[in-house]
């Protein structure tokens, strides 16, 4: 099994998929190769807004935070499931190498994939108040991205891209070269 991350950031070669996989893998105790990242926007299946896409360093200023937040929520659910399965406290669970285990006791563990299967195949046996499934959606909306004003103007960027080109030229006065 693997973890899938879907983001509405559309990279143009900046390595968004690599960064997203590394963040999620780190939070969930997996290898980045165990994380599949979908970095496309299909308006038939995904909500689109003015804030969707890739511009003005939006990925590092907004999307990375949403990815980390969703991964932390999934990790909390996994720890709750592991605690229930292993009969320990959720705060005593660590996620390492694809397993949820008792901190410092690798032998007392359960594969994360087994916990994910439990949420799907046996939802009646989940801890109280836990919804079936193991997925999260995180939306981060910075305060300065306010609603449209009376003239329907809207701020669409948290940061602004810029480019600075610098050229250093050395000329030998004697030869003009």
Predicted regions and their residues:
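Cofactor-centric catalytic regions
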Residues: 1-28, 40-177
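Generic long, charged, amphipathic alpha-helical segments
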Residues: 33-39
């Amino acid at each position: 099994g693997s973890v899938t991350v879907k983001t509405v950031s559309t990279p143009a070669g900046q390595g968004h998929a690599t960064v997203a996989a590394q963040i999620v893998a780190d939070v969930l105790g997996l290898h980045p190769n165990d994380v599949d990242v979908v970095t496309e926007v299909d308006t038939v299946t995904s909500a689109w807004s003015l804030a969707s896409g890739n511009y003005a360093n939006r990925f590092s200023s907004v999307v990375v935070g949403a990815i980390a937040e969703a991964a932390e929520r999934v990790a909390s659910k996994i720890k709750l499931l592991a605690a229930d399965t292993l009969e320990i406290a959720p705060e005593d669970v660590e996620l390492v190498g694809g397993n949820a285990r008792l901190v410092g006791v690798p032998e007392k563990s359960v594969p994360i994939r087994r916990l994910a299967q439990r949420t799907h195949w046996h939802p009646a046996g989940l801890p109280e108040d836990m919804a079936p499934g193991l997925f999260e959606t995180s939306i981060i909306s910075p305060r300065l991205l306010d609603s449209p004003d009376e003239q329907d103007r809207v701020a669409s960027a948290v940061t602004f891209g810029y480019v600075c080109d610098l050229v250093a030229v050395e000329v030998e006065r004697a030869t003009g070269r």
